[in-house]
From Swiss-Prot:
It comes from the Bacteria. SUPFAM superfamilies: ClpS-like, Ribosomal protein L7/12, oligomerisation (N-terminal) domain. The gene is rplL. Transmembrane segments: none annotated. Belongs to the bacterial ribosomal protein bL12 family. GO terms for biological process: translation. It comes from Ruegeria sp. (strain TM1040) (Silicibacter sp.). This is Large ribosomal subunit protein bL12. Homodimer. Part of the ribosomal stalk of the 50S ribosomal subunit. Forms a multimeric L10(L12)X complex, where L10 forms an elongated spine to which 2 to 4 L12 dimers bind in a sequential fashion. Binds GTP-bound translation factors. The lineage of its organism: Bacteria, Pseudomonadati, Pseudomonadota, Alphaproteobacteria, Rhodobacterales.
Length: 125
């Protein structure tokens, strides 16, 4: 029972990017399709984990608030920043959320600048 509780806590603590990677692994290796509401639940759990990073102020999370009118350019930038595939980057841009987490201020500002230049609304948390 303790193992299941630890597994559940690990899943709830995933960032949006980690949840996307988990979804891909489950789909490709095990043939498990995600439920329709899964992304919304994981995004809420990812925000809870971001609270600890805010207290430190040495690490920042880059959060995509809105892709803006030129979503294709934003998807291209997200792919370049994260190394995700086209489909995963598109899903991340459409859902919004953390693009990168736990980065130093200089890198976070650089990523924010690139995404804003592509037309996105970005916030550092």
């Amino acid at each position: 029972m303790a193992d299941l509780k630890a597994l559940a806590e690990s899943i709830v603590g995933l960032t949006l990017l980690e949840a996307q990677e988990l979804k891909t692994i489950l789909k490709d290796e095990y043939g498990i399709e995600p439920a329709a509401g899964g992304a919304v639940m994981v995004a809420a759990g990812g925000d809870a984990a971001g609270g600890a990073a805010e207290e430190e102020k040495t690490e920042f999370d880059v959060v995509l608030k809105n892709a803006g009118a030129s979503k294709i350019n934003v998807i291209k930038e997200v792919r370049g920043i994260t190394g995700l595939g086209l489909k995963e980057a598109k899903e991340l841009v459409e859902a919004g959320g953390k693009i990168k987490e736990g980065v130093d201020k200089a890198e976070a500002e650089d990523i924010k600048g690139k995404l804003e230049a592509a037309g996105a609304e970005v916030e550092l948390a």
